[in-house]
Design a protein with these regions (language model features):
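C-terminal substrate-recognition "lid" of short-chain dehydrogenase/reductases
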Residues: 25, 92, 131-134, 142, ...
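Substrate-binding pocket helix/loop in short-chain dehydrogenase/reductase
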Residues: 109-111, 118-123, 223
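Alpha-helical segment proximal to the catalytic Tyr-Lys
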Residues: 139, 183-187, 251
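Residue(s) in the substrate-gating loop at a strand-loop-helix junction
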Residues: 154
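Short C-terminal tail/terminal secondary-structure segment
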Residues: 12-15, 105-108, 254-290
């Protein structure tokens, strides 16, 4: 019996890798962000869920009681990102993980037809938002002497042709920023890494591929048909990667891009995603979130 209890205790420790840790997750109200909130809480973390989608964010926080607090956050506004970080410290006493995940897909289509203002919006959310998250996480983590900064890139940040021009440029930039931050902050005990999801079933990708954010099953079938493994990525897959990078299991992982794509990028990807979605995205609305 004692041996069995000891085994159960070890298993519990393995599944509670984030026990006592505090995280800020942007883009937390849906998709990858919401999946990561669930995973982090399951592994023992307290979470500040930051998102511009207020109603969904408050509903998410209500599921977890005191373990999750929501704050409305537009990641293009520095004072709002700073407030999310400050809330983590005020509410939970520290900040162990900053997950820069908020995003949009931007306008899909030929570069000659891309409105400059839409380009600016895409870059502001996807790249400036990550910069602000890194900046204010560093403000807390440097004196703390520890921390993990995780930023969501994409397979579009590894290859071209898998997203809009603004999206692709920003996601390449996220990888560069993650590496640059890693090289600066490592001496302070702070790690910085990026995750590059492949095709992942969310409301945003459903909008791009089907024109309807609710057609998740149809989206999954299409993604599975294009996957080397024959399966579609789910938010939980990216959440698992984030939990690993946030944990002490990844203590030597720094400046890394963790590609979670079922092998898509090993074969050069494909450009059907951007071409098939362009018309439908314009009709459905271009600012759907992760």
């Amino acid at each position: 019996l004692d041996a069995q209890l000891g085994l159960l205790e070890r298993i519990n420790l393995m599944t509670k890798r984030l026990e006592g840790m505090v995280a800020v997750i942007t883009g937390a109200s849906s998709g990858i962000g919401a999946g990561t909130v669930h995973r982090f809480v399951e592994e023992g973390a307290s979470v500040v869920a930051a998102d511009i989608q207020e109603q969904a964010g408050e509903a998410l926080a209500a599921e977890f009681g005191e373990s999750v607090v929501f704050i409305r956050t537009d990641v293009t506004q520095e004072e709002q990102v700073a407030a999310a970080v400050d809330l983590a410290v005020e509410k939970f006493g520290r900040l162990d993980c900053m997950f820069n995940n908020a995003g949009i897909v931007g306008v899909v289509g030929p570069i000659a037809d891309t409105p400059t203002e839409d380009w600016d919006t895409t870059i502001a959310i996807l790249l400036k938002g990550v910069f602000l998250g890194c900046k204010h996480a560093a403000r807390v983590m440097i004196p703390q002497g520890s921390g993990s900064i995780i930023s969501t890139s994409s397979t579009a940040g590894v290859l071209g042709g898998l997203g809009s021009h603004g999206y692709t440029a920003a996601k390449h930039g996220v990888i560069g920023l993650a590496k640059s931050v890693a090289s600066e902050l490592s001496e302070h005990g702070v790690r910085s890494n990026a995750i590059a999801p492949g095709n992942t079933v969310t409301a945003m990708t459903a909008t791009v591929t089907t024109g309807d954010h609710e057609k998740l099953e149809e989206t999954a079938e299409g993604m599975a048909s294009r996957s080397m493994l024959g399966i579609a990525g789910q938010p939980e897959d990216i959440a698992a990667a984030a939990a690993y990078l946030a944990s002490n299991d990844a203590r030597l992982v720094n400046g890394h891009v963790l590609v979670v794509d079922g092998g898509q990028t090993t074969s050069g990807g494909n450009n059907r995603f951007i071409k098939s979605g362009s018309g439908m995205l314009r009709e459905a609305g271009k600012w759907d979130r992760y």
